[in-house]
Amino acid sequence: MKLILAPMATLTHAALRSTIAQFGGCDEYYTEMIQAGTLLTGGPFEKYYLFTDPEPEKIVWQITGGKIPAMVEAAKMLSQMDGIGVDINMGCCAPDIVRSGAGIAWMLKERRETEELVEQVGAVVRGAGKRFSVKLRLGDEDFTEESFFSFVDMLAQRGVQQVALHPRTKKEKYRRPPRLHYVGQLVRYIEEKGYAIQVVLNGNVQDSESACHAMNQSPGIAGIMIGRAAAQKPWAFRQIAQALGRDTGREEDRSEPFTVDLLETGCHFVRELEKFQPQEFYKTRLQRFFAFYSDNVQFAHHLRTRLLNHPTPEGCLQQLEEYFAAAPHERFKEENPPHEQFNVL
């Protein structure tokens, strides 16, 4: 079972990956979605999206864009870099992205246009010896099982090797629980058809208990993709790996509890952000991370407000130091592994 970091704008950059790696890392790190057109024009900030630290061999480059030629050229460029492969974003529902013809718009366009995109991008990625994957949703609000599985047929017939399904529709976002049973149906459908595609589940997995629930709802999946929970708890992958009975990459016995230093972990993220991101990105990246990370303490709203109001490296370091100086009992968080390993049905 692969454990995978989901692609998240302003979050899944090298600083977060480095913070996760402190706790043993994960199997695949999807990047922030990279705008194909901007990458090709060589914008001043594009190089910051191309760092592969700390584990280059585990990088999955996710691209987005509404124009086929730019997507193909971006895929060609990224296929020559370190990493597992290239992923097309067909799931983002942000209005600006959809209006540009990118993200989930590819699931809603005239089928022939999307077929052409998949054929051409897949050819350059596989030609470079890299894996070709797609991240998608169920479709629009009026989707049917027939239309969804027909779309999967198209992907499979054009050489997609892995799909990550976020089982919500375009408008559902996080308002309702993900329909995990569709992931299980997708696994069975692919098996019945004999397609050589791995299925990854994405949606509301936060810890070992929710991972176990997801696996029972969707037997046969090849991996679990974790998003926001990895920002709140960069050690979440380690917890789940322990529950799976896997080697966590740590010297400690995987059955033993482990202690997280919340001050040091937060400070580590800030220091890594300074190393891997331009000053122009500090505010958005700090605010985005600490909006989630603050939930680890008792007075989360208080700490979050202080951090979001001081969105500079110096400001965040100071606020973290002051908070834990006033509440030293909250600094060290003991994480206990489950009493038993996953009982997957």
Protein language model annotation of sequence segments:
Residues 1-345:
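Flavin-dependent oxidoreductase catalytic cores
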